[in-house]
């Protein structure tokens, strides 16, 4: 966007932190928003330093912080490696959540989520998504589930399973937002990874 936008964000984050508010951020990198002469690594690390809850992905951790997660690791070990490196750069965070997309042997989309909370790492099972209506907004749904779980004072496992349910269920809805009931989330979690 612009340097002015970054400055306003910094000021808002400082005020929110002074007021004791919980601050969340989706650190996904959008290259089309960075056309004003500064690299995101010059702006985002400082802004993310104010945040308590962060979602994102391994590639963005590299773009913002230079974290080179080895590609040959399992998803769990990639997440662990990235979180350990992020913790050194963002020591104040309470939760980091990530979702991982893939495909199974018959090329159906898969979705798995991970959380780091209180230095505990938990992964969900791998969910197969046999039919996708629209995946746009699934990251926002994932973050919504993460925030909901946090605000409900769920434990780390409950939070990441809630977030995963929101992310997976969004794939069945048209448009870039989702409206999911708590009953639907709980039913999804109880039915397990074959959904």
Segments and roles (model prediction):
Residues 122, 126-191:
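Conserved post-catalytic alpha-helical subdomain immediately downstream of the catalytic base
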